UniProtKB/Swiss-Prot annotation:
NCBIfam families reported for this sequence: PRK00281.2-5 (NF001394), undec_PP_bacA (TIGR00753)
Name of the top EC class for this enzyme: hydrolase
Gene designation per UniProt: uppP
Enzyme Commission number: 3.6.1.27
Record protein name field: Undecaprenyl-diphosphatase
GO terms of molecular function: undecaprenyl-diphosphatase activity
Family: Belongs to the UppP family.
Localization, UniProt: Cell inner membrane
Organism in which the protein naturally occurs: Synechococcus sp. (strain WH7803)
Amino acid sequence: MESAVSEPGLLEAIWRDFVLGVVQGLTEFLPISSTAHLKIVPVLAGWGDPGVSVTAVIQLGSIVAVIAYFRADLAAVLRGISGAVRRGQWREPEARLGIAMTIGTLPILFAGLAIKLYWPGYETSPLRSVPAIAGVSILMALLLALAERFGPRSKQLDQVQGRDGLLVGLAQVLALIPGVSRSGSTLTASLFDSWKRPDAARFSFLLGIPAITIAGLVELKDAFTEPSAGGVLPLMVGIVSAAVVSWLAIDWLLKFLQRHSTWVFVIYRLLFGILLLAWWAGSGSN
């Protein structure tokens, strides 16, 4: 059973939100699940559930970072779509990327809306329990291992088609299950879909921008109904730390995958899931 946690003071709230911002920034874009880590880290630190008001607002940092990092790509996509509308040049790489991003965003939008409308108990469902998150982490590690082992890795971003957006977009829906990882599911699907590792990661990030932004804004409205300890200052610290670390994580992963495989993430997710199960079994927590 979880014990009651007292409301933190200002300095503790600043430290908590700073750490949560770092965790958010690291885990949002690395294929290791931000939801899992944002659930587990506060429990291990003895902070309890930080609440929607904290996690939703801090996520703004990651949204700002990913849009800023890929601003040139997004501008090129907008120019490509605009040119295609005016001149019918839908076969240009930028236009095809825009189409793929649009198609790939629709499945998670519909699935997320369906959950909001028809599954009121989602936030407290067994899917969000520690053993479920641990099991999902292990399963996703195995799927990523298979994709790494058997994916042909020949496709580049300028070859993207609408079907790629649909395939990876359907995989993105799995991110609604805590512990899956949005970037993990889309990266895994892209590797199965024959993408080269750096292009798979880049497409995963670009495809995720609409979903991350919309989800963040939807959750943000709940922040105004939940007062946060310490007021605005801790949240601002969390936003800034999330933005900085998100930028660094995106940049690092794109460079890392130029020369390395995803096996390090497979191993991490396996260990994370196993250790999480061991901790849960030993503590008797839910």
